[in-house]
């Protein structure tokens, strides 16, 4: 156990450091997501600058790079505390990727993937919370913030032994969204539908 957990933490960070948004945009001939749209290399920004196909590819890869290290560690019998650190390491890799100049995304999809191995029931509830919030508000960032706030309570209900590590993960996501929280408070955050309409008008 003592040797497996630190090794999985390093593996998770390196997996997280593979920025799928940047790679997909390069392969598809799209602008660098760090320099276009919102400047965030994540699925939402790729949706704005490249459309649904590219965004779905980024979303899937970002989820997998959080899911695979945690699932592997879970299968190896790593304890919940270490699983939390492994999940955080994957998100830290996404946020500060060593392969891309430490300029990454906000870690939402990767965090979702890291939580998924806890159970499909929890995964469905989390996805539903994010989707409902976005549909009602139009803010992708608000969906992430609300999901991060509620996630520890969901986990406590389904599998309480994972409440602490998921709480650590939620804190990381909320800290990463501090600029979005300020813009939402000032009513300066742009709705995702507005940005998509602007893109269609340009096209």
From Swiss-Prot:
Any one Gene Ontology cellular component term annotated for this protein: plasma membrane
GO molecular function: acyl-phosphate glycerol-3-phosphate acyltransferase activity; glycerol-3-phosphate O-acyltransferase activity
Coiled coil found in the keyword field: no
Gene Ontology BP term (one): phospholipid biosynthetic process
Ranges of the Periplasmic topological domain: 1-3, 74-80, 133-137
Membrane topology: Multi-pass membrane protein
Catalytic function, reaction form: sn-glycerol 3-phosphate + an acyl-CoA = a 1-acyl-sn-glycero-3-phosphate + CoA; a fatty acyl-[ACP] + sn-glycerol 3-phosphate = a 1-acyl-sn-glycero-3-phosphate + holo-[ACP]
Parts of the chain that traverse the membrane: 4-24, 53-73, 81-101, 112-132, 138-158
EC number: 2.3.1.15, 2.3.1.n5
UniProt keyword annotation of Ubl conjugation present: no
Cytoplasmic side: 25-52, 102-111, 159-203
Record's subcellular location: Cell inner membrane
Main location: membrane
Keywords associated with the record: Cell inner membrane, Cell membrane, Lipid biosynthesis, Lipid metabolism, Membrane, Phospholipid biosynthesis, Phospholipid metabolism, Transferase, Transmembrane, Transmembrane helix
Known pathway: Lipid metabolism; phospholipid metabolism
Family under the similarity heading: Belongs to the PlsY family.
HAMAP family: PlsY
Protein task: Catalyzes the transfer of an acyl group from acyl-ACP to glycerol-3-phosphate (G3P) to form lysophosphatidic acid (LPA). This enzyme can also utilize acyl-CoA as fatty acyl donor, but not acyl-PO(4).
Subunit structure: Probably interacts with PlsX.
Official protein name in the record: Glycerol-3-phosphate acyltransferase
Native species: Salmonella typhimurium (strain LT2 / SGSC1412 / ATCC 700720)
